[in-house]
């Protein structure tokens, strides 16, 4: 029963199925900000 409930919660509602690939990518966005901070500091010479 618990496994079925967890599986049900892991599925997106039908109205949002089209956004599935986008939701897979969204958690990566904060990593881009981290990389941006290093690129920015490299460009200003790590003041």
Curated annotation (Swiss-Prot):
GO biological process: photosynthesis
UniProt keywords, alphabetically: Membrane, Photosynthesis, Photosystem II, Reaction center, Thylakoid, Transmembrane, Transmembrane helix
Gene Ontology CC terms: photosystem II reaction center; plasma membrane-derived thylakoid membrane
Membrane topology qualifier: Single-pass membrane protein
Proregion positions: 1-10
Transmembrane segments: 19-39
Pfam (any one): PsbK
Subcellular localization: Cellular thylakoid membrane
Main location class: membrane
Organism domain of life: Bacteria
InterPro entries: PSII_PsbK (IPR003687), PSII_PsbK_sf (IPR037270)
Record SUPFAM superfamilies: Photosystem II reaction center protein K, PsbK (SSF161037)
Chain's role: One of the components of the core complex of photosystem II (PSII). PSII is a light-driven water:plastoquinone oxidoreductase that uses light energy to abstract electrons from H(2)O, generating O(2) and a proton gradient subsequently used for ATP formation. It consists of a core antenna complex that captures photons, and an electron transfer chain that converts photonic excitation into a charge separation.
Entry's family note: Belongs to the PsbK family.
Quaternary organization: PSII is composed of 1 copy each of membrane proteins PsbA, PsbB, PsbC, PsbD, PsbE, PsbF, PsbH, PsbI, PsbJ, PsbK, PsbL, PsbM, PsbT, PsbX, PsbY, PsbZ, Psb30/Ycf12, peripheral proteins PsbO, CyanoQ (PsbQ), PsbU, PsbV and a large number of cofactors. It forms dimeric complexes.
Protein name, per record: Photosystem II reaction center protein K
Native organism: Synechococcus sp. (strain CC9311)
Lineage: Bacteria, Bacillati, Cyanobacteriota, Cyanophyceae, Synechococcales
């Amino acid at each position: 029963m618990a496994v079925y409930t967890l599986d049900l919660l892991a599925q997106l509602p039908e109205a949002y199925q089209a956004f599935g690939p986008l939701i897979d990518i969204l958690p990566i966005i904060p990593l881009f900000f981290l990389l941006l901070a290093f690129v920015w500091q490299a460009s200003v010479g790590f003041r």
